Amino acid sequence: MLRFSLALTKGDFALQAEAPKPCQRLALMGPSGVGKSTLLSALAGFEGQAQGTVHLGGQTLAAGKTGLAPESRRLGMVFQRPLLFPHLTAEENLRFARPPTPPPVTFEEVVARLDLGPVLPRRAHQLSGGEAQRVALGRAVLAAPSWLLLDEPFSNLDPARREAALCLIDEVVERQGLTLVLATHRLEEAVSLCDHLVSLREQNGVSTGTAQPLAQALGGAQAPTLISGMLQEARGTLEFCYGGQALRVKAAPFLREKDRAGPAAALIDPQDVHALPAGAPAPLGCPRFEGQRQGADQLRYGEDVFTLPVPLGPGDESVAFTLLGATVLPPRRRDALAVAER
């Protein structure tokens, strides 16, 4: 469990953030440049100017130069730009973590779950961004940390590998009771993995944020706008709700197959709803739907007219739209989805 109260000033940038009550799975969200990565680094002990305290379990870690060094905090960290030893192979980078206790998953399981087999012999500087990100995630898990600090850890992954990585992190955190701090701009990642949310906002030149339970944060006035959907197996439709509206689309097979134990759920960030000219190819791996455009922010699909919270931009009257960023939530997280529905 994690509690903290931190303040940091670097030149013209100032940050104040706190989690006054213990939380195990914490998401950091907010616009670019608001300080998500800086807060993550301060929690890890990399920001010498930070002031305040960090409480992890029964241990108190002072912030700044007087605090416990990062290498002594038993943390697994994945930076936004993965840091690997460039002249070691991917396998050597994974095996570099030699924890004092057995890791929560085996080397073989990490390789299989993150699809790392083909890249094991290659040196880190030869890896693509997505490959390096998967190696960094695997190494962090194999270090058997007490807590995981992840900075946009899925940003370079394709949809299938992204979901595999999400599931692995979720299972490891649940199985080992780890503390997780995730910096992300994608709402569906935060809801899939976290129970608490710090929504950082700049006010009077200072970035501020206080941790809240996820359901409370999503229901608040400062919550990110979202469109939530529930898969209705009997009708074979995916119903997205926002502002009392409903948009029913034919359920994509990949959503139906993800959760066979019961109805699936999906969250979509409106920034990931795109209108395409009719006939234009949809992005790879994304479900595509044909509809009619009405004005700047309305879509007619079948019998439904749906007003989006963001304008669609220029396009033809007949459009295809894609729903990017859809994710199927674990059953235990559907209560947050139900609260978040508008």
Name the predicted role of every residue range.
Residues 59-63, 104-119, 170-171:
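Conserved ABC ATPase "signature" region
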Residues 60-77:
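ABC ATPase NBD coupling module
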Residues 123-127, 131-133:
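Conserved ABC ATPase signature
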Residues 142-146:
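A short, proline-enriched helix->beta-strand linker immediately N-terminal to the Walker B motif
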Residues 148-152:
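Catalytic Walker B motif of ABC-type/P-loop ATPase nucleotide-binding domains
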Residues 244-288, 311-342:
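Glycine/charge-rich catalytic "coupling/switch" loops of P-loop NTPases
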